[in-house]
């Protein structure tokens, strides 16, 4: 979670909602990170989870991320939850419930 929080600060610096995501393999090694890039790239789908999933699949050369964990600072929205399920990520850890944050 510390790594995800550090990545979230990068989103804040670029004017985005400070959400960070980290994908780790079964050994606990970081495979990819992502932060919100909606403002940075004018892309409404560039949420932290989506960015991290895209980077992980490119780095690993496959779209199935079985036996991987995604750690996110904020509960995933429905779009991101769907992407997490579709990429077969086995474990999700998040730091705060979306319904408790007013963004």
Where are these predicted regions, by residue range?
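A short, polar/charged loop-to-alpha-helix boundary motif
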Residues: 40-51
């Amino acid at each position: 979670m510390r790594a995800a929080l550090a990545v979230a600060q990068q989103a804040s610096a670029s004017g985005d909602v400070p959400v960070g995501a980290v994908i780790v393999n079964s050994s606990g090694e970081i495979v990819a990170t992502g932060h919100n890039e909606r403002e940075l790239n004018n892309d409404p789908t560039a949420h932290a989870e989506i960015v991290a999933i895209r980077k992980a699949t490119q780095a690993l050369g496959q779209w199935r991320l079985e036996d991987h964990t995604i750690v996110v600072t904020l509960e995933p929205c429905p779009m991101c939850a769907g992407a997490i399920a579709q990429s077969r990520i086995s474990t999700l850890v998040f730091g705060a419930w979306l319904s408790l944050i007013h963004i």
